[in-house]
């Protein structure tokens, strides 16, 4: 049976006492550590801080004769949602994880989720109407918020590509769906 313990800040927890309680239990075997440090993290330094924390934790556990076999590093790596955003420095992170793995002789588990699948979807839509507003044009498409709800729910940005060259678009435009709902929009 798997048990989990959340340690937000080791200085606030009597870490050694907890470890000894676990170690002396007939029902608990400590063999893995798992972390979750956030989502859409764009830099490597938070992950490096986490690896340093794990190095210290594994060293403390080793002193108590507890061998960690697995470390689940979770996910958290960001993905770019448009061409302006920079990509996550994966090679640098991978190098740091490799060194951590070698130092601690553990198997690494990742939960990359969005990092692997976040950019694989595409919606192909056609313009069904152009509405002239006072300050901008609205391009009404045959796709709606029910096809891509992330913008309505999270104000998420997605790259919009047109078959026309961008320099041919002279005025501010907003791409929207045909549902009469203020959040049925995809972006400008």
Regions found by a protein language model. Give the residues of each.
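Short, small-residue-biased leader/transition segments that mark boundaries at the very start
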Residues: 2-7
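Active-site mouth loops of central-metabolism enzymes
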Residues: 8-13, 40, 44-46
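Structured alpha-helical segments in the cores of large, soluble enzyme domains
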Residues: 11-29, 54-66
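Conserved strand-turn element in the central/C-terminal portion of the radical SAM core barrel
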Residues: 29-42
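Glycine-rich beta-strand-to-loop/alpha-helix junction loops that act as flexible
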Residues: 37-38, 71-81, 112-114
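Short glycine/threonine-rich loop-to-helix capping motif typified by GTGT followed
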Residues: 43-49, 80-92, 118-129, 188
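Alpha-helix-loop-beta-strand connector modules within alpha/beta enzyme cores
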Residues: 54, 93-103
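Charged (often Lys/Glu-rich) extended helix/loop segments that serve as interaction or gating elements
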Residues: 96, 105-188
